[in-house]
């Protein structure tokens, strides 16, 4: 099985990191989650509904849609907060990458542990820019919102392709495909990791600075 890999790049102000990452990660998970499975007997089941809610950002002109699961939101917020703290403490000019990996488990014989096989990985490269004044911050607020809107469209286009998804599991195998620990939603098994690096390149940051400069010149 080949693992799909998608890379998104964003350039944001420090106070926008949380909202930008939450918006993108929640958008992906919205399309990679189902309602809870309710098995009647082996081979037959019903799927519960998945509620959604709009989230307005405070520091970006952007609204995203997420699964209305407070449990899932807490997990994502915790991971994003850790990533933001690591960015702030790194001294690497505010560059890093946060990744959302979907995987399925393959049972192994005792005494070996189960094998985790990734089937889709989303990597978000982040560059934090420093702005000089409130005028630049307002422009950045608008431009980042536009860029995130483009990223959301890109995410939806990728997810709507007819490519590999794990097949619906039997009741005995559901934990090999889905995270069943949440009471109100059932995302595909996933993990979030991050790394801080000074080797991401400066193309995104340069583009954002150029956008701000061009807008100021109007």
From Swiss-Prot:
Please give the Gene Ontology molecular function terms for this protein.
Answer: protein kinase binding
Q: Which UniProt keywords apply?
A: Autophagy, Cytoplasm
Which top-level group of life is the source organism from? Eukaryota
Give the GO cellular component terms, alphabetically: Atg1/ULK1 kinase complex; phagophore assembly site
Q: Which InterPro entries match?
A: ATG101 (IPR012445)
Q: Where in the cell is it found?
A: Cytoplasm; Preautophagosomal structure
Q: Name one Pfam family in it.
A: ATG101
Membrane-crossing residues? none
Which GO biological-process labels does this protein carry? autophagosome assembly
According to its UniProt entry, the function of this protein is described as: Autophagy factor required for autophagosome formation.
The protein's matches in PANTHER family, at most eight in alphabetical order, are given as: AUTOPHAGY-RELATED PROTEIN 101
Family, similarity comment: Belongs to the ATG101 family.
* Protein name as catalogued: Autophagy-related protein 101
């Amino acid at each position: 099985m080949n693992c799909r890999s998608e890379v998104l790049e964003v350039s944001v102000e420090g106070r926008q990191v949380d909202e930008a990452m939450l918006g993108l990660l929640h958008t992906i998970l919205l399309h990679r989650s189902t309602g809870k499975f309710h098995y009647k007997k082996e081979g037959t089941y019903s799927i519960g509904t998945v509620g959604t809610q709009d989230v307005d950002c405070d520091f970006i002109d952007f609204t995203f849609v997420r699964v209305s699961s407070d449990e899932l939101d807490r997990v994502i917020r915790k991971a994003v907060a850790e990533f933001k703290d690591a960015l702030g403490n790194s001294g690497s000019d505010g560059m890093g990458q946060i990744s959302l990996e979907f995987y399925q488990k393959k049972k192994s014989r005792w005494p070996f542990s189960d094998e985790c096989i990734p089937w889709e990985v989303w990597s978000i490269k982040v560059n934090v820019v420093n702005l000089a004044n409130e005028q630049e911050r307002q422009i950045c607020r608008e431009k980042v919102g536009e860029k995130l809107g483009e990223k959301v469209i890109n995410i939806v286009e990728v997810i709507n392709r007819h490519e590999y998804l794990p097949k619906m599991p039997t009741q005995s195998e559901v934990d090999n495909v889905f995270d069943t620990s949440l009471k109100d939603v059932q995302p595909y098994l996933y993990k979030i990791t991050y790394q801080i690096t000074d080797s991401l390149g400066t193309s995104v940051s340069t583009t954002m600075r150029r956008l701000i400069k061009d807008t100021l010149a109007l």
